[in-house]
Amino acid sequence: MANIRKTHPLLKIINGAFIDLPTPSNISVWWNFGSLLGLCLVTQILTGLFLAMHYTADISTAFSSVAHICRDVNYGWLIRNIHANGASFFFICLYLHVARGMYYGSYLQKETWNIGVILLLLTMMTAFVGYVLPWGQMSFWGATVITNLLSAFPYIGDTLVQWIWGGFSVDNGTLTRFFAFHFLLPFVIAGASMIHLLVLHQTGSNNPTGLNSDADKVTFHPYFSYKDLFGFILMLVGLTSVALFSPNLLGDPDNFTPANPLVTPPHIKPEWYFLFAYAILRSIPNKLGGVLALLFSILVLMLVPMLHTSKQRGNTFRPPSQILFWALVADMLVLTWIGGQPVEHPFVLIGQVASTIYFALFLIALPLTGWLENKALNWN
């Protein structure tokens, strides 16, 4: 008699995705981040649900309700700290997951890659609206600055901004709708993740060599389920350590001050995981140009599969492309640093140079290097 997990209508879907899934035997620890992102999403949804039970989306009580959660709710301080720092861990895993895809040429599975880029945009949007909810100074001014960017679009800009605000400034209507979006979007992300996984399992995973692995596959369980479990434990230990020992390490001190529309903080900056994009936005003096550069800094990922010129899939056997990949990583770190600095010399110039290098690497250097590597391989 056949095993129930292979015959039951629901169980066989789970079986095909997580138990008997044929997996390349040589995938490294860099392939752990997909499941870690799933863990992050579940953690954020659960902690967020418990926070939403005690939070009030009203400008007169939002800040106080967060203080109430931390002071009076059973383990409220822990739930909030895990939720706030969980976002940072989410983005660490996201950026590493995208970097792995870039390095090993996983972007050649175009549907999976494009859904992944959409997931990245959705997650960034969710994190942005979530940052507004505690209604501290940086929440309020961050919301004001970023939503105001939409006014750069010709003709419809001002109407668009007021439509998003629900009035003539960031006010109660804005907070209420941002809370609604912040509650809804994680479930949209969960749905899109299912599609991401479904599309991935049509082709199967890539592997570090970039070669076809049909000849050497193993079942996902027990080999990679335990490998993922080890990753889960490591990440949860890291997250709980940050949440318990230094919960405010990655936050902004300005957000401990209730929002005041009459006092602007000296340096308005987003959370650390948006600083690279913020630096690109600030490096262009023109408002519309800055907004387009900000959008394109993420959407450029969608062009990567089209700009792939090499005959080899990954960077494993391509030293020149490896150098450029690590140059891109270094450039993003420089942009992250610049995004947190004030708008003054020499930071403005460094930001402009780093932004130019960022786009030049994606659009010119990487495709050109791939083409040159092909030439070198044919050279005799």
Swiss-Prot record:
It is found in: Mitochondrion inner membrane. GO terms for molecular function: metal ion binding; ubiquinol-cytochrome-c reductase activity. Heme b b566 binds at H97, H196. Keywords: Electron transport, Heme, Iron, Membrane, Metal-binding, Mitochondrion, Mitochondrion inner membrane, Respiratory chain, Transmembrane, Transmembrane helix, Transport, Ubiquinone. Heme b b562 binds at H83, H182. This is Cytochrome b. The keyword Protein biosynthesis does not apply. The cytochrome bc1 complex contains 3 respiratory subunits (MT-CYB, CYC1 and UQCRFS1), 2 core proteins (UQCRC1 and UQCRC2) and probably 6 low-molecular weight proteins. The chain crosses the membrane at residues 33-53, 77-98, 113-133, 178-198, 226-246, 288-308, 320-340, 347-367. Belongs to the cytochrome b family.
